[in-house]
């Protein structure tokens, strides 16, 4: 059933609201993907707080008009699924990971920080560790010298006690 004008305006407004908050937009062609596989992709996207939507390209073009993602409009051809996320890496990671296991999902383009990326750029962005991973690595690096120092002090204290006894 075709969308009437009000429905189209509502879709554009919804997507524009997501795009306004987004740091990353990823476009992927989904020709020939089974419904079950698309459902799995959507579930993975929900877990990572990625807004994933199949849209008419004309509606998507209107939604990105006047935003840093406007240059992506040139790439909006064919049957596309749009991944939009506030996290700089999440959309690229979700789409890239799924495309590895399902060759019918083909990454077409993406945009991050006002720059349009090709497939290789999206894959490079997806290979960056997530914010949580980076924070845990930083915490580990910061704790290592402190815990080593604490162990050295404990060993010194034990040695002094052994000498005193």
From Swiss-Prot:
InterPro entries: Ribosomal_uL10, Ribosomal_uL10-like_sf, Ribosomal_uL10_bac, Ribosomal_uL10_bac_type. SUPFAM superfamilies: Ribosomal protein L10-like. One of its GO terms (molecular function) is large ribosomal subunit rRNA binding. Part of the ribosomal stalk of the 50S ribosomal subunit. The N-terminus interacts with L11 and the large rRNA to form the base of the stalk. The C-terminus forms an elongated spine to which L12 dimers bind in a sequential fashion forming a multimeric L10(L12)X complex. Forms part of the ribosomal stalk, playing a central role in the interaction of the ribosome with GTP-bound translation factors. Belongs to the universal ribosomal protein uL10 family. This is Large ribosomal subunit protein uL10. The gene is rplJ.
């Amino acid at each position: 059933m075709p969308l009437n004008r009000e429905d189209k305006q509502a879709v554009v407004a919804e997507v524009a609201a997501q795009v306004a908050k987004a740091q990353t937009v990823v476009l992927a062609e989904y020709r020939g993907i089974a419904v079950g596989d698309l459902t799995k992709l959507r579930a993975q996207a929900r877990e990572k707080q990625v807004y994933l939507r199949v849209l008419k390209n004309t509606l998507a073009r209107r939604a990105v008009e006047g935003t840093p993602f406007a240059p992506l409009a040139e790439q909006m051809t064919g049957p596309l699924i749009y991944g939009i996320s506030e996290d700089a890496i999440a959309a690229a990671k979700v789409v890239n990971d799924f495309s590895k296991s399902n060759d019918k999902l083909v990454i077409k383009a993406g945009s991050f920080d006002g720059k349009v990326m090709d497939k290789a750029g999206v894959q490079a962005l997806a290979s960056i560790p997530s914010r949580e991973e980076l924070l845990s690595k930083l915490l580990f690096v910061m704790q290592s010298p402190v815990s080593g120092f604490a162990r050295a002090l404990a060993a010194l204290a034990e040695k002094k006690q052994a000498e005193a006894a």
